[in-house]
From Swiss-Prot:
The keyword Secreted applies. This is Glycine, alanine and asparagine-rich protein. GO terms for cellular component: extracellular region. Its main location: secreted. It comes from Haliotis asinina (Donkey's ear abalone). Residues 1-17 form the signal peptide. Residues 462-507 are annotated as: Disordered.
């Protein structure tokens, strides 16, 4: 910033010294013509040459200061641009930490990359570019306008440092300008024949030199310290960013590993789900097949049960038909046998009746004398057949006749007066009723015995009238029901008996 004005000033002083003949600068003094003032001019020339040398030394120091500032600016620009970027003022390429340095003491624009950014013009950098750690106002020597950079300070601190350095340089330049103006005025006065205040000029030059040297050294020291601090901060920031980047990379790799593990787990879960679905489907098919087989088995069992039931019903019907026909045949044969037996008994009874008739004819006179009456029996075949009692003396004959003919096809005849006779045996119909016997004179009249039932019901016992009537005995039932006991004047008659084979049943 100060290089061009200082060089112009030094060139002007050197040319002026050569022009006025004071021996300042490179050419020295050529001396002057004239006689009287030779010694004074020689001393003035020597003094001016010494001053010119001092001014040259001052200019050299200022030039060194400017060069040091340029070197510091280059270093700051290199630090601001990042690692791997271009130098001060140049444009940094895209890369790990590069960026383009802009115009100014140490700033520049950093390019896009891992840690770079664009630095603006000025003492300590400008806006940072895009990248991992860059951004607007990111990278630079001491920070720039905008956001924070890779290793830079804040924009306000950089601006304050830049303003302070600029003010100090401006004060040094003002002091040097004042010294230069005073030297020119003194030189012009001496050239015009005036006196030269060498002590004042030397004092001004020394003061300017001291001021410029002190302030330049202070600026350089502060700039160096600030640059070193910035470099250390940048290195720490870079180390932190590198650690963060490595942590991020490791996190990304870990996330990728977890993602791959998750993908493998998802794949295994999908495979398991597919296997489970396949198992469920196969189980469903097996269940459907088992259900179909069970239904077929149930249908076959139902058909077998239906066939067995039909066969059992058919066998039962056939057995019932066979047993019914057998029982019918047995009943028919039994009925035929019963009819044959009854016919035989009728024949035997007829013979006995013939014999009894003869006996009855002979005994009728004695029967009339004893007060007995002859009871006429009904027809034994179809009505109330059989004979009644022939009196007390003819009970045996009457009983035999009644048993033979009393109930062939109908009921037994009624007993005559006196001791009632026994009812005839019942045939296929109902047994004959016992005759009603009248009690004898003062005797106990016995009720007639009911006839023996044939295939039908037994005859009813006769009712005994007269004295103390006894209970008539009911007829003995054969295939039918026993006859009812006769009613006496005394006790009731006893019921007949059922014959079932060889066993008796009384009621």
């Amino acid at each position: 910033m100060l290089r061009v004005p200082l060089l112009v000033l030094c060139l002007a002083l050197s040319v002026g010294a050569d022009y006025y003949g004071y021996g300042w600068g490179r050419n020295g003094g050529g001396g002057g013509s004239g006689g009287g003032s030779g010694s004074s001019r020689a001393s003035a020339s020597a003094s001016a040459s010494a001053r010119a040398n001092s001014i040259g030394n001052l200019v050299g120091r200022l030039t060194s200061l400017v060069d040091a500032s340029a070197s510091a600016r280059a270093s700051a620009s290199a630090n601001a641009g990042g690692f791997g970027g271009s130098g001060a003022g140049g444009s940094g390429g895209n890369g790990f930490g590069g960026g383009s340095g802009g115009s100014g003491f140490g700033g520049g624009s950093g390019g896009s990359g891992f840690g770079g950014g664009s630095g603006g013009s000025g003492f300590g950098g400008g806006s940072g570019g895009s990248g991992f750690g860059g951004g607007s106002g990111g990278s630079g020597f001491g920070g720039g306008s905008g956001g924070s950079g890779f290793g830079g300070a804040s924009a306000s601190a950089s601006a304050q440092a830049l303003a302070s350095a600029t003010a100090e340089l401006q004060a040094a330049q003002d002091a040097y300008d004042q010294a230069s103006a005073y030297a020119e005025a003194t030189a012009r006065a001496a050239a015009n024949g005036g006196s030269l205040d060498s002590s004042a000029l030397a004092s001004a030059i020394a003061s300017a030199e001291a001021s410029v040297s002190a302030r330049g050294a202070s600026i350089i020291a502060r700039a160096r310290a600030r640059a070193e601090a910035t470099v250390r901060a940048a290195r720490r920031s870079f180390a932190s960013a590198q650690a963060s980047a490595e942590a991020s990379v490791s996190a990304v790799r870990s996330a990728e590993g977890r993602a791959r593990s998750f993908a493998r787990a998802v794949a295994r879960a999908r495979a398991s789900a597919r296997a489970a679905i396949a198992g469920v489907r196969s189980s469903g098919r097996a269940f459907a097949s088992a259900t179909a087989r069970a239904r077929a088995s149930v249908s076959a069992a139902a058909r077998a049960v239906a066939r067995a039931r039909a066969q059992a019903v058919a066998r039962a019907r056939a057995s019932i038909r066979a047993s019914a026909s057998a029982s019918a045949r047995a009943s028919a044969s039994a009925a035929a046998e019963a009819r044959a037996a009854a016919y035989a008994r009728v024949q035997v009874a007829a013979a006995a009746a013939a014999r009894a008739a003869a006996s009855a004819a002979s005994a009728s006179a004695s029967a009339s004398a004893s007060g007995s009456s002859f009871g006429s029996g009904g027809s034994g075949g179809s009505g109330n057949g059989g004979f009644g009692s022939f009196g007390a003396s003819a009970n045996a004959v009457a009983n035999a006749f009644a048993q033979a003919f009393g109930g062939g096809l109908g009921n037994g005849g009624n007993g005559g007066n006196g001791n009632g006779g026994n009812g005839g045996n019942g045939g296929n119909g109902n047994g004959g009723n016992g005759g009603n016997g009248n009690g004898g004179n003062g005797g106990n009249g016995n009720g007639g015995n009911g006839g023996n039932g044939g295939n039908g019901n037994g005859g009813n016992g006769g009712n005994g009238n007269g004295g103390n009537g006894r209970n008539g005995n009911g007829g003995n039932g054969r295939n039918g029901n026993g006859g009812n006991g006769g009613n006496g004047n005394g006790r009731n008659g006893r019921g007949g008996r059922y014959y079932y084979g060889s066993s008796d049943y009384y009621y």
